[in-house]
Structures are given as C-alpha cells and as structure tokens.
Regions:
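Short, well-structured alpha-helical interface segments that form or flank functional binding sites
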Residues: 170
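Beta-rich carbohydrate-recognition and catalytic domains
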Residues: 1-116, 120-167, 177-225
Length: 225
C-alpha cells in the first residue's frame, strides 16, 4: 500500500510516498517511505500516482512538482510525471525523469495542473491517463501511450468537461473495464452544488461508456456520483 505522506509534521508539506505491507489486508506493517522529494524535478513534492510491473520489478509512476522561472522573472509551478523502479523495499528513480512533461501537452492544456497518473498495460503497450484542465478552466483527462514506460506519446484528451458543469481540475482519475463497459472515475474540483449533491466543492464522479481502443475515443454517459 502506497499513500501520500508528510513524515515531519501534521501539517501540509512536500509530499512523500508512505509504504505499508500486509499478508492478510487486516494487519499492516509500516515500511520506510519509498519516494521523497529529493530531485530538482520533484523538490516540491512527490504527488500521487499508480504502479505497474515490468520485468519482475515494481514501477511507480508519480507526479513530480517543481518550480520554473519564467522569462519575466516570475516563478511558476510545474507538474510532470516521473517513474521509479523497485523490489518492494527499495525504489530508485529513473535517470530519464521526468518521463512526461507539460511540454508534451497541446497548447490549451495546463502545465500547472497536470497530475495523478494512472497506468495500465494492454497487449505490448502501456497506457496512462493524467488529470488536467484546459485554458478555459474546465477539467479533463489526457491519455498517453508507451512501449517501455520511459518514452511516452500524447494520444488525446480522453474525456473533458465540455458543459462546464463538472468542476475545474479533474484529480485522481482511474479508467477500467467492467463487464464490457468502461468506467472513468475522477475527483473534480470546484463543483457547483446540485440539490443535495456536491456541496463540499471537491467530489468524486464516474462516467460509464464505450472505449474504442484503436481510435482512443471514449463515448461517455452523463456523470454519476
């Protein structure tokens, strides 16, 4: 089990990845942190992500947060996707990090709000979705593909908040198939209250739909909570 963790205080701080293990899902043993913000590309935090397996090793994929200086001298945050390889105890960050940067996104996609990668393997390829928002402050999920987990290609905006009613940034997306139907789960920020729902601003919704694996299109139904 991996989780967001700031080991030094009970207040918000640069995120680490905590680590616990169990052989029965009931009794857990705390392990040393597996990721710490110790590189230039993630010095402001190792945000959440997901994991897969390659060649018998764990592969953690996470969002590294850093700052960049703009041409006018101002400082702006950047969120990029990074990987680390491990054996269940010790994890080493790839020298290729960050493996996905905001510069790989279309021009109208945010480089600041670009986080929480979910990875999976289909056939010989790996796929990854990341939460994002566009220049109109509407949430969306973007899709990338790779053959080796280190060189990635932008594919498409898989789903978006085209109506403007489903919040701004879409955090922590997940995408999977269940009984022939694909589901996209995400946590939109800044949702507007609707009757008895969405009164805390940050929520979780899911979309059911059909995914075309060749064209990378997702025909989604209306969101449900």
């Amino acid at each position: 089990l991996f989780y967001q963790y700031h080991p030094y205080t009970t207040e918000w701080g640069p995120m680490h990845w905590g680590h616990s293990v169990s052989d029965d899902m009931i009794h857990w043993k705390n392990m040393p942190s597996v990721l710490a913000p110790d590189q230039e590309y993630d010095k402001r935090g190792c945000f959440s992500g997901s994991a897969t397996e390659k060649d018998g090793k764990h592969v953690l994929i996470y969002t590294g947060v850093s700052n960049v200086q703009m041409e006018n001298g101002s400082i702006q945050e950047r969120q990029n996707q990074c990987i680390a390889y491990g054996d269940g105890e010790i994890y080493v960050k790839s020298p290729q990090n960050p493996v996905i940067t905001g510069d790989m996104l279309p021009a109208d996609c945010s480089k600041i709000d670009f986080r929480d990668p979910k990875v999976w393997k289909k056939g010989k390829n790996y796929y990854l979705i990341v939460g994002n928002k566009n220049s109109e402050q509407k949430g969306q999920v973007v899709l990338f593909s790779s053959k080796n987990l280190e060189k990635w290609k932008f594919e498409t905006v898989l789903a978006e908040n085209s109506t403007g009613q489903i919040g701004t940034m879409w955090e922590c997306p997940d995408f999977f198939e269940l009984d022939g139907t694909h589901f996209l789960i995400c946590s939109p920020q800044n949702m507007k209250a609707q009757k008895y729902e969405f009164h805390n601003g940050n929520n979780s919704v899911y979309f059911a739909g059909k995914y075309n694996e060749t064209e990378h299109t997702f025909q989604k139904e209306a969101p449900k909570s």
